């Protein structure tokens, strides 16, 4: 279970595609991508839960591909386990609702429980499944994903947060303050108030990173380019552009703005030295089955 209430928006340019092939026998320890070996156990556990639910013994070969960096603080595990939960259950002959899939995916990644829903969803602390807050067309938001480094991060999100919870004096205050921020975010989304949403989002992100910086030893995800992009966002806001930053457990910056300002924001943060590239995303749909084989996607 996650330790605090969480809000979430699904975006259309951060997509994971998963493909499953049933095979009579397979070595469940086989790893196609050694850089993701730490996820293998969770993948097997999810497949085992699906097999038990469908009363199957069949093994599966899994291919999962993101169109955004993996293990870099961009919610690749959330997207990945959401996609796998849907693909695995359909391959097993199960037709589960999004709510039931959310319950299944949550055991692998709390954030995956929210990623199944398009638009805006929430996962209250301790809940088994996420709930939809608003559809994607409720609020004309855009997220400018600003990539500040290449490659995976040195410390995984789960490892970093467990260490922070165990050693940081700022962890408990952050968690205690989360319900207030959660209500601010929820009301802001329902009322279409980007100012209120952005302020709460920035506050939450900074509290999280402050707690990690105070861990012993410190968990440091923010890089010089990260800080420079944050400064650029504040500059844009001082000039009247509604732009607000957030960072997950990683160095990349996600800039929240309105759709009409997204191109200008992307151009501005893209000029910051060290920025690799930017991706403009809008609200995305529910997780869905596709005929496109992820192995054919570049």
Question: Which residue stretches match the model-derived regions?
Answer:
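ATP-binding N-lobe of GHMP and related small-molecule kinases
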Residues: 1-72, 86-98, 267-268, 279-298
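Short beta-strand scaffold segments in enzyme catalytic cores
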Residues: 1-2, 17, 112-115, 119-122, ...
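Short alpha-helical "patches" and their helix-cap loops
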Residues: 13-14, 98-104, 158-166
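Short alpha-helix boundary/capping segments
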Residues: 35-38, 75-76, 170-173
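Short, well-ordered alpha-helical segments
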Residues: 41-44, 82, 227, 263
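Gly/Ser-rich oxyanion-binding loop with an adjacent helix/lid
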Residues: 56-140
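C-terminal nucleotide
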Residues: 135-298
């Amino acid at each position: 279970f996650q330790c605090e209430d969480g809000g979430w928006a699904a975006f259309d340019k951060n997509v994971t595609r998963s493909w499953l092939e049933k095979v009579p026998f397979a070595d469940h320890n086989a790893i196609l991508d050694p850089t993701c070996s730490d996820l293998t156990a969770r993948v097997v556990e999810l497949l085992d839960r699906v097999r038990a639910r469908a009363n199957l013994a069949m093994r599966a070969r899994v291919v999962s591909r993101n169109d955004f960096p993996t293990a870099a603080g961009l919610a690749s595990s959330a997207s990945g386990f959401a996609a796998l939960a849907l693909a695995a259950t359909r391959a097993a002959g199960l037709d589960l609702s999004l709510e039931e899939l959310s319950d299944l995916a949550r055991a692998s990644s709390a954030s995956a429980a929210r990623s199944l829903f398009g638009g805006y969803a929430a996962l209250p602390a301790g809940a088994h499944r996420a709930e939809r807050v608003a559809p994607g067309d409720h609020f004309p938001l855009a997220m400018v994903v600003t990539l500040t480094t290449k490659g995976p991060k040195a410390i995984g999100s789960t490892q970093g947060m467990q260490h922070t919870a165990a050693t940081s004096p700022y962890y408990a205050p952050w968690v205690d303050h989360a319900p207030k921020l959660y209500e601010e975010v929820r009301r802001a989304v329902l009322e279409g108030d980007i100012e209120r949403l952005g302020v709460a989002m920035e506050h939450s992100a900074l509290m999280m990173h402050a707690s990690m910086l105070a861990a012993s030893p410190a968990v440091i995800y923010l890089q010089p380019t990260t800080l420079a992009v944050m400064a650029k966002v504040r500059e844009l806001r001082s000039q009247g552009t509604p732009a607000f930053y957030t960072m997950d457990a990683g160095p990349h910056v996600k800039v929240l703005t309105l759709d009409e300002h997204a191109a200008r924001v992307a151009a501005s943060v893209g000029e910051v030295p060290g920025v690799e590239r930017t991706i403009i995303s809008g609200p995305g749909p529910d997780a869905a089955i596709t005929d496109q084989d992820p192995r054919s996607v570049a």
